[in-house]
Curated annotation (Swiss-Prot):
UniProt keyword annotations, A-Z: Ribonucleoprotein, Ribosomal protein
NCBIfam families per UniProt: PRK00596.1, rpsJ_bact
Top-level taxon of the source organism: Bacteria
CC terms in the record's Gene Ontology section: ribonucleoprotein complex; ribosome
Record-stated family: Belongs to the universal ribosomal protein uS10 family.
Gene for this chain: rpsJ
Subunit description: Part of the 30S ribosomal subunit.
GO BP terms: translation
GO molecular function, one term: structural constituent of ribosome
Protein name: Small ribosomal subunit protein uS10
Length: 102
């Protein structure tokens, strides 16, 4: 498929799991002789939640919780039908969200 590119966005709370998944995708794509760009680390999305510790008073005493979403981007240039079949069969961990754009 000349001139086509596949863009894969990976999201996860655990950066180690995300890096392992990205490495696995890159290895599989390289086995099918397609060009790979990435994994490119995207900015981490950080959400902070501030909650009062006491339900009644002590407004100065608060707890802070944060949620971090790590992201990676992989571009596959000049994919072949073998590449697409290999990507469909890949088995990734449950904590990784995969978004594929053709």
């Amino acid at each position: 498929m000349p001139g086509q590119k596949i863009r894969i966005r990976l999201k996860a709370y655990d950066h180690k799991l995300l890096d392992e998944s990205a490495k696995k995708i890159v290895e599989i794509v390289k086995q099918t002789n397609a060009k790979v760009s990435g994994p490119i680390p995207l900015p981490t999305e950080r959400t902070l939640y501030v909650v009062l510790r006491s339900p009644l008073k002590h407004k100065d005493s608060r707890e802070q919780f944060e949620k971090r979403i790590h992201k990676r981007l992989i571009d596959i240039l000049e994919p072949s039908p073998k590449t697409i079949d290999a990507l469909m069969k890949i088995n990734l961990p449950a904590g990784v969200d995969v978004e594929i754009n053709l």
